[in-house]
Structures are given as C-alpha cells and as structure tokens.
C-alpha cells in the first residue's frame, strides 16, 4: 500500500484453484484439477493464495479491504472447454515434472474432452477473488 498515493486504490485479483468443481464428479476433471494445482505449485505459485488476499492486505496495515468473489459456471459453449484447454497447455509440464506419463495425460485429455462435450455436465472456472482498498490521507509530517 506504500506505493499507492493518498486516496489511491490498491487492487489485486487472483484465481483460487481449490474452488474448481464439476457435476457430475468426473475422474478426468479431478486429474486436471490436481495437475493444474501441482504444476502451478512447482513453478512457485500457490493454488489457494487468492482466498488469503484479504489477510495479506490486513497484514500490511492496509485499511479494511473490500472483496468480491466471482465464479463462472458453464453448461455449454466455449467457456466449458477451459479445463480441457488448460490441461492441454500444461501437458508437457506434467510429463516433464514426472507427475504422470504422456499416455496418462493423453488419456485424461481425451476423457475430459468427452466429458465437457456432454450436454448434461456442469464445469466451473476457478473462483476469482478481487480485493481492493483505498489508502487514507497521508499524515506524515512531510505530507502536511
């Protein structure tokens, strides 16, 4: 918050991967969820960081932040393909990290492709946390 000018706003948005879900439950979707979180963690990310953003704001002495939670859920169309596209994009990272074999990843991709193509399924995107706070007036002697 030190970089925000008095009256300025600090805003942060992050995805919470631990909130992913589908209906009905599906092994290919669960594989995608586990692999996405693991690949992110191995690259220094934190799959559950977003839900702690409010605490991070408070820990820095930031005024009480505002928070908004968004989560898209799809029953059809292009948005429903996001898990499949993500799994395809991280396939090489999964294999190179030794998390699964190329054959296992290929099978999971095909399984997820069939699942997301079904009209009777529901698929979520990660929850998106939006957190923001306004910096109060600067009361340091130099600012007076």
Question: Across the structure, where does each feature detected by a protein language model lie?
Answer:
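A short glycine-rich, Lys/Arg-flanked "PGG" loop and its adjoining helix->strand segment in the class I
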Residues: 1-9
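Conserved adenosyl
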Residues: 6, 108-110, 144
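Conserved catalytic/acceptor-binding region of the Class I
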Residues: 9-78
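A generic alpha-helix surface/boundary motif
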Residues: 34, 51, 88-89, 127
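Short beta-strand
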Residues: 47, 123-124
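Amphipathic alpha-helical interaction segments
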Residues: 52-55, 107, 128
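C-terminal helical/coil "lid" or tail adjacent to the Rossmann-like core of SAM-dependent
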Residues: 60, 64-123
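Core SAM-dependent methyltransferase catalytic element
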Residues: 60-63, 83-86, 126-144
């Amino acid at each position: 918050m030190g970089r925000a000018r008095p009256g300025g706003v600090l805003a942060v948005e992050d995805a919470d991967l631990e909130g992913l879900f589908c209906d009905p439950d599906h092994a290919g979707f669960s594989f995608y969820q586990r692999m996405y979180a693991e690949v992110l963690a191995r690259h220094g990310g934190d799959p559950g960081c977003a839900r702690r953003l409010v605490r991070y704001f408070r820990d820095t002495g930031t005024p009480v932040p505002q928070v908004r939670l968004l989560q898209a859920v799809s029953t059809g169309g292009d948005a429903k393909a996001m898990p499949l596209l993500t799994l395809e994009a991280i396939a090489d990272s999964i294999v190179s990290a030794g998390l699964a074999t190329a054959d296992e990843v290929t099978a999971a991709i095909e399984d997820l492709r069939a699942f997301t193509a079904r009209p009777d399924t529901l698929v979520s995107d990660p929850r998106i946390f939006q957190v923001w706070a306004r910096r109060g007036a600067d009361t340091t002697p130099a600012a007076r």
